[in-house]
């Protein structure tokens, strides 16, 4: 019997038939072979495929599709020529309407893992985009040479091979154009290009960002040292070939690292920042400032957060993990007061600046953790009616969840970028809170990511 069990386990290189049951959290197909769970990128729910094992991990196996025996009716041809090599998108081969259904299903599965009772009826259909292409406002592409030509792209997963991306289908047309212009000029001026294997050369990365509403573009060159040969010519060419570029910056990163930005950033030409607007708010974006990557869907997400908060104008709001203050400022007009906190002091400085620029007098921002500030404010007699959390992928700190359960605001609005940590945290809050609904929002079409807004009300 022991022998038989051992034989049924998969081995690397083995081919086997499998039916795909669902999509995993990273967009891969999930199937079972002799009760062993197998993750297969590129396979879709309902498909029958022949797969080949690529890796055996503890408790699961990874495999690749060798042949699709029975294709999903929702399978489409990915329009991007480097889709399978690049790895930036995971779901271009799935019809967009079905992507939205599957993203909801990923959320349903995440909650099933943590909850005794089904949450399915509380999880709403995913809010998608009318045009799910060319939505990203920022591009960071590595620079290399191939057959003496300057290329820009991303490294193939787990390799040093740079995939040339001439036109990214999820990047805004202005960022694609700016990257193309810069790489053409670098080639024309014969500027030294960084070689990742030899770790020699000057220009490592081209970062381009567009302010979608104003049309302003910012270009940042990441280099290994400060000296930039033909600097004046480079600036003149960029400005001539693409007048929308209002800010040309340089950042120096000499470290052997995959982290893109180094510590030193300075202006080469134009302005330090570009102007972007989001609804009624305007923002100044410096080269390193955080800003949501899909402004169109950010408005949808923030409006959902506002709906969930159900404000009457009298509420005191806490914006935990506030960053540069975007969500809190989105709510401030409809609230009595917004208090935000973040552990990054620079973000708090930006939040204060943003609030001041918009003339808000009912906001207050502090550097530090919510679990430190909240008890202090409650002690001083200031108790929030609504707490909004928008944590990183890892979810809320346990201490913050404990603090929320002690402070007991009437509403908690949870904005999440990871269904798994969301479901775990919501389960912890259900000691005192009722889930009204979960609203998935598709911020990143053609990828496996899904954001959510959850409305929780005190029992």
Swiss-Prot record:
Q: Does the record bear Methyltransferase in its keywords?
A: yes
Which EC numbers does the record give? Answer: 2.1.1.-
State one molecular function term (GO).
Answer: 4 iron, 4 sulfur cluster binding
User: Which UniProt keyword terms apply here?
Assistant: 4Fe-4S, Iron, Iron-sulfur, Metal-binding, Methyltransferase, S-adenosyl-L-methionine, Transferase
Binding residues for S-adenosyl-L-methionine: 292, 321, 342, 390
Identify the residues that bind [4Fe-4S] cluster: 80, 86, 89, 168
What GO biological process terms does the UniProt entry carry, in alphabetical order? rRNA base methylation
Q: Where is the active site?
A: 417
Segments forming domain TRAM: 9-67
SUPFAM superfamilies the UniProt entry points to: Nucleic acid-binding proteins, S-adenosyl-L-methionine-dependent methyltransferases
Carries keyword Transferase?
A: yes
- Which PROSITE patterns does this entry report, sorted A to Z? SAM_MT_RNA_M5U (PS51687), TRAM (PS50926), TRMA_1 (PS01230), TRMA_2 (PS01231)
Family that this chain belongs to: Belongs to the class I-like SAM-binding methyltransferase superfamily. RNA M5U methyltransferase family.
- Show the NCBIfam families listed in the entry: rumA (TIGR00479)
Tell me what this protein is called. Uncharacterized RNA methyltransferase BA_0426/GBAA_0426/BAS0414
The scientific name of the source species is Bacillus anthracis
Specify the taxonomic lineage: Bacteria, Bacillati, Bacillota, Bacilli, Bacillales
């Amino acid at each position: 019997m022991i022998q038989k069990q051992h034989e049924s386990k998969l081995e690397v290189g083995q081919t086997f038939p499998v039916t795909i049951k669902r999509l995993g959290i990273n967009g891969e197909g999930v199937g079972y072979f002799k009760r062993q769970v197998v993750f297969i990128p590129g396979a879709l729910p309902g498909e029958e495929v022949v797969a080949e094992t690529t890796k055996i991990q503890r408790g699961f196996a990874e495999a690749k599709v060798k042949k699709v025996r029975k294709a999903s009716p929702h399978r489409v041809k990915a329009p991007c020529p480097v889709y399978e090599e690049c790895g930036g998108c995971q779901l271009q081969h799935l019809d967009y309407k079905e992507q939205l259904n599957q993203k909801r299903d990923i959320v349903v599965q995440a909650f099933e893992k943590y909850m005794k009772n089904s949450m399915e009826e509380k999880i709403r259909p995913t809010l998608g985009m009318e045009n799910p292409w060319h939505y990203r406002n920022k591009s960071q592409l590595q620079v290399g040479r191939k057959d003496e030509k300057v290329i820009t792209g991303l490294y193939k997963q787990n390799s040093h091979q740079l995939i040339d991306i001439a036109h990214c289908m999820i990047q805004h047309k202005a960022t694609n154009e700016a990257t193309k212009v810069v790489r053409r000029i670098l080639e024309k001026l014969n500027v030294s290009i960084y070689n990742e294997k030899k770790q020699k050369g000057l220009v490592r990365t081209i970062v381009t960002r567009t302010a979608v509403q104003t049309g302003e573009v910012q270009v940042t060159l990441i280099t290994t040292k400060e000296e930039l040969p033909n600097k004046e010519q480079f600036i003149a060419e960029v400005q001539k070939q693409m007048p929308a570029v209002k800010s040309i910056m340089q950042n120096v990163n000499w470290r052997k690292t995959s982290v893109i930005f180094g510590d030193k950033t300075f202006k080469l030409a134009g302005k330090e920042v570009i102007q972007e607007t989001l609804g009624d708010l305007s923002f100044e974006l410096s080269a390193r400032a955080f800003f949501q990557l899909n402004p169109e869907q950010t408005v949808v997400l923030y409006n959902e957060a506002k709906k969930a908060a159900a404000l009457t104008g009298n509420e005191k709001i806490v914006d935990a993990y506030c960053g540069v203050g975007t969500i809190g400022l989105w709510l401030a007009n409809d609230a009595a007061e917004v208090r935000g906190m973040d552990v990054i002091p620079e973000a708090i400085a930006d939040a204060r600046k943003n609030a001041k620029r918009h003339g808000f007098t009912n906001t207050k921002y502090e550097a530090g953790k919510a679990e430190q500030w909240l008890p202090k404010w409650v002690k001083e007699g200031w108790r929030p009616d609504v707490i909004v959390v928008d944590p990183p992928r890892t979810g809320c700190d346990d201490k913050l969840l404990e603090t929320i359960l002690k402070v007991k605001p009437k509403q908690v609005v949870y904005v999440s970028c990871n269904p798994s940590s969301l479901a775990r945290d919501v389960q912890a809050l259900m000691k005192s809170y009722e889930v009204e609904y979960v609203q998935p929002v598709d911020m990143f079409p053609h990828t496996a990511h899904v954001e959510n807004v959850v409305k929780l009300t005190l029992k």
